[in-house]
Amino acid sequence: MGARASVLSGGELDKWEKIRLRPGGKKQYKLKHIVWASRELERFAVNPGLLETSEGCRQILGQLQPSLQTGSEELRSLYNTIAVLYCVHQRIDVKDTKEALDKIEEEQNKSKKKAQQAAADTGNNSQVSQNYPIVQNLQGQMVHQAISPRTLNAWVKVVEEKAFSPEVIPMFSALSEGATPQDLNTMLNTVGGHQAAMQMLKETINEEAAEWDRLHPVHAGPIAPGQMREPRGSDIAGTTSTLQEQIGWMTHNPPIPVGEIYKRWIILGLNKIVRMYSPTSILDIRQGPKEPFRDYVDRFYKTLRAEQASQEVKNWMTETLLVQNANPDCKTILKALGPGATLEEMMTACQGVGGPGHKARVLAEAMSQVTNPATIMIQKGNFRNQRKTVKCFNCGKEGHIAKNCRAPRKKGCWKCGKEGHQMKDCTERQANFLREDLAFPQGKAREFSSEQTRANSPTRRELQVWGRDNNSLSEAGADRQGTVSFSFPQITLWQRPLVTIKIGGQLKEALLDTGADDTVLEEMNLPGRWKPKMIGGIGGFIKVRQYDQILIEICGHKAIGTVLVGPTPVNIIGRNLLTQIGCTLNFPISPIETVPVKLKPGMDGPKVKQWPLTEEKIKALVEICTEMEKEGKISKIGPENPYNTPVFAIKKKDSTKWRKLVDFRELNKRTQDFWEVQLGIPHPAGLKQKKSVTVLDVGDAYFSVPLDKDFRKYTAFTIPSINNETPGIRYQYNVLPQGWKGSPAIFQCSMTKILEPFRKQNPDIVIYQYMDDLYVGSDLEIGQHRTKIEELRQHLLRWGFTTPDKKHQKEPPFLWMGYELHPDKWTVQPIVLPEKDSWTVNDIQKLVGKLNWASQIYAGIKVRQLCKLLRGTKALTEVVPLTEEAELELAENREILKEPVHGVYYDPSKDLIAEIQKQGQGQWTYQIYQEPFKNLKTGKYARMKGAHTNDVKQLTEAVQKIATESIVIWGKTPKFKLPIQKETWEAWWTEYWQATWIPEWEFVNTPPLVKLWYQLEKEPIIGAETFYVDGAANRETKLGKAGYVTDRGRQKVVPLTDTTNQKTELQAIHLALQDSGLEVNIVTDSQYALGIIQAQPDKSESELVSQIIEQLIKKEKVYLAWVPAHKGIGGNEQVDGLVSAGIRKVLFLDGIDKAQEEHEKYHSNWRAMASDFNLPPVVAKEIVASCDKCQLKGEAMHGQVDCSPGIWQLDCTHLEGKVILVAVHVASGYIEAEVIPAETGQETAYFLLKLAGRWPVKTVHTDNGSNFTSTTVKAACWWAGIKQEFGIPYNPQSQGVIESMNKELKKIIGQVRDQAEHLKTAVQMAVFIHNFKRKGGIGGYSAGERIVDIIATDIQTKELQKQITKIQNFRVYYRDSRDPVWKGPAKLLWKGEGAVVIQDNSDIKVVPRRKAKIIRDYGKQMAGDDCVASRQDED
């Protein structure tokens, strides 16, 4: 005892006995706990002496910790005791066991981190930087490695395939690891085609950049030598910063990780986009009754990633909703696992529950019961020298019999498996020729269409009679492998294959036995001579009579052969006759799974009437449908199907045959949407050159894939009769119909699954699959290649896909996807342009389509003038006269197409080069090649993305189109050769605001070169005449004026008709350009006009803008400036008076002076001025921009945190050595602030009581400053009934709002400080400005308006809530317009004078007051023990 007590000294023992066993508990540690621990350690063979030191305790803890997971409660108690003892030895103050365990965990984590850091340090000594893509070169400089085409390709593929689903965000994060803003912009520009998403992203980036500028103001004064300037928001976004600057910031000491910051902004934007593209809520994700648990979990987590919630909320969703929304089967299993189950345990437990896998397993179990190996009768002509392998009836193994079996005895009969008797007493002793148990009663062989069995049956074994024709009696040989009719009987082996045969004029039932050599029938008389014979069977040898050349009819097929007659227990048709009729035993692999299809929610199938058809069309349709029905593609239906789609027939091209067409437009509108598996067609320029090539075509592609059984009814159609002689013949599709929107996607999906095993087995063979066209290429010798092709054809045939010889191309040139492929080159299939005297709209559309197709290899093709002919809404048959330009364009294209042109195949080892030439009139042509004059492909670009553009902008768009096209075809971008000089390029892009990615390029001197036709000056031109221009128009009369006044006293006004304000502004600029010299200054107040001209367009769809461009090109120098409504520029007020007379109704000019005066006093933001003085936003913004005190930073955003109306945040800030106590109303951004003498509890409590006297304060949130935690403040809060919260980690009410308001307040104080003598005056002025002179945020109010609105709304909603709870106690019975029956009861939502609003189920309706009866809801009356209902029950 003494030895054990010596573990702790006196002082330590006192500490030990003060520590509680549990947090908040009464029991404390005693000496007995140390005695117990030392005894337990002896039990575990651990030295108890270790307890005397902290190091010994640490060693014991290290030994015990691994066993905690599996150990008993005693072991855990021992660990806890030693942990507390360790803390006492180490003099760590702890109050209870939990605190001691936390301290130990903290120490262990620290030691782990140190070890990891040490390991990382030793590993990283050799590396200078791991920050891809910025690396250190041999000279020690930090250089940038551009983002690779492979990474860009991966990113493009992700976006194209996932379409901004939640997976896009982690993928973007992974691909952009360590990237610079320039790399990130490159990634964004490669997916620039997604306009809506990119616009959302751009807005988010702009918002974040403005917020960055607000929080990081520019330091005044010059930058110190050796220091870098601080990045602005636009620098981080890569718009106004160079690559070198970005590298400098990222590698600076300390670094500014601009790449990571920009990446964070982009991810914020991507989150918004994902939310838009994935609108499904996590609450809507429920597991279907047959959906596998794995698929449900995939959907659940995919939607969870798109949810905008914190990680804690997401964890809660996973723990509760995942189980809650599972189907009943899985939910039962999941609940049994308990609350702490991991996802792995859940998925393992629910594996295979529900879904096709579960179904297949149940089916397999059923089959295993039916198909137990039974006795086998082998019938052979001669059994001599045959040795039978012995097989045990008990365990099923070969080599011993049941009597000698050592395995446990199997219950029941060894023959039939039933209990209650042994095998010797079994009644089922007859020879079983089927090798299956007699599981089903005898029945006739049923006719199944190939399509139905494929679509409906699970994994199956089938006996199939492959019929050719009734007269075919020759032995089946190699000549029979080719064509096979699809209307043969299929006899499944779920029951014995008994069929009716006709022999000697008699009908008999016989068993089809593929294991018997001969045909044996029971006693009967047959004509002709016979000879005696002995045959062996399971029951021994039997004597039979042999008849030769006997005619037998089996399943409608005739055969002549040898028949044996004798005492057989069952009639057997053996292989000697089965081979003649083409019978085979098939083991087909699982059929193509049908893809489940549904209609759009809330829609029903099509019910479109059949229109009348001519007699020849009806006859043709009847013939086609009869044949299709035989093949199982369609089935007849009765009148119970209410759906219908019109059907008609057209003649095939160059043929007398008819083709059936079904007008599925209405069904397509109602069918669910499908995701197209392939986003485009493969291009021959992307093919690698192969030694051997074959092109195959899948025959009747769609008709080989079954349609979902539940969807077939919607494909119903009717063939009418002439003069309605009889009711129409009704059919529905069993397979994918031509013309239905789901057929391409389902077929492609099925085909991909079928080809997958062949692709895996033959990785060296390239298979390009697009719909029913297959391109197969390999580097094998032609003989081996063709063997592989036959294997592929057989593989497809097993799944029911035929590849007709007619379309099997073995020799070049191969016709594929509209292309002509040769061994070493490719081209488009010959194109013949029609010669016509008159052209209809339809003719021109087809012509443009042909030319576009040809342009991918014929360089220089143009279609701009031909497309102009199609502008406007015209009927397809309308004749369009060709313009002179269009005729010339068509003639040029004919010349180009006269000479055949070929493209070559892609060589992965060589670089891609793209060269672009300008053709004029906004048209561009390009060639992509690897070797000069050997084009991979060519193309054209002629798209104008805006009304006004210039060549540089169009060239950029063309480059981006070619780069995207290259990534799709080859997975990388080419090097570009562009007809533009670097100087021209720089002159344009340094001024142009939009950041655009351009890949690597070089100048190539190919006339005509791209140039800028004019440039605007950046500063006013000294000595040039200045024109003040303006225009105005009346909206109602469309009358307007445009004019100018110059600084030299000239003026001019021109009246205009049928015009707009925008046109008059442009007209005024045109007048100034016309009447001015070679150098001119122009001042306008039109942002619209400024925006057009500053982009330096050189072509425009607008005639007026084109005229302005002509004038600009003639000038030597032009300076264009904008002013807000001519403020401060003498001549402009005159011109405004000139053009406004009798035109403008409302002028905002008067408001500008007042707004400027107010801004000089209060420095209001632009929203407040626009609202108070009725100014256009652009004018209000200009006033703010011209103020030297306001243009330093972006303005603050208010009202962005949505919180309860009673919550305030308090904080102290310091300025000029004084303390300012600030309170902010979180929901509105309203501020109360005061300069206090000292930062004490007394002053804070007094301020808090004043605040509570003015506003309803429910909660105050502060930091842990001594003045806020003082008893005085606590007493004040208690008295005023205010709840006090402090800034603890993970508290959702962070101090962020008050911190930003402090900065905002200081900023405003800085703006007005020179207007006040004392700081306390400036503080109150700043509070006034903030609360009443700044608008923005929620509702566009000022903070003062917003707090009043929030409090008033809170009172109203509380009152309204009381009214709602009262009104919900009423129920309404109502009548619809013409229905006399009273409906209801419905819930009363609102009662007005003339009508009531009610909710009936989920529908909300408005019912006139006269058609509604309102009654109070007293609840359901329950039947009591003595009520009439109970008495009736007793009777």
Swiss-Prot record:
Annotated zinc fingers (CCHC-type), start-end: 390-407, 411-428
One record GO biological process: proteolysis
Chain positions of motif Tryptophan repeat motif: 985-1001
EC number in record: 3.4.23.16, 2.7.7.49, 2.7.7.7, 3.1.26.13
Record PTM Phosphoserine, positions in chain: S148
Domain Peptidase A2: 508-577
Start-end of Integrase-type zinc fingers: 1150-1191
Location of the region described as Dimerization/Multimerization of capsid protein p24 in the Swiss-Prot/TrEMBL record: 277-363
Protein's organism: Human immunodeficiency virus type 1 group M subtype B (isolate NY5) (HIV-1)
Chain spans, region Dimerization of protease: 489-493, 537-543, 576-588
Region annotation Interaction with host AP3D1: where it falls in the sequence: 12-19
SUPFAM superfamilies listed in its UniProt record: Acid proteases, DNA-binding domain of retroviral integrase, DNA/RNA polymerases, N-terminal Zn binding domain of HIV integrase, Retroviral matrix proteins, Retrovirus capsid dimerization domain-like, Retrovirus capsid protein, N-terminal core domain, Retrovirus zinc finger-like domains
Outcome reported for the amino acid change (mutating S67A): Loss of ability to fuse with target cell membranes and infect host cell
Lipidation (N-myristoyl glycine): G2
Annotated CDD domains: HIV_retropepsin_like (cd05482), RT_Rtv (cd01645)
Region (Interaction with human PPIA/CYPA and NUP153) location: 189-227
Cofactor binding description: Binds 2 magnesium ions for reverse transcriptase polymerase activity. Binds 2 magnesium ions for ribonuclease H (RNase H) activity. Substrate-binding is a precondition for magnesium binding.
Residues that coordinate or bind Zn(2+): H1159, H1163, C1187, C1190
GO cellular component: host cell; host cell nucleus; host cell plasma membrane; host multivesicular body; membrane; viral nucleocapsid; virion membrane
Name of the protein this chain belongs to: Gag-Pol polyprotein
Cofactor(s) the protein requires to work: Mg(2+)
Annotated region described as RT 'primer grip', given as residue ranges: 814-822
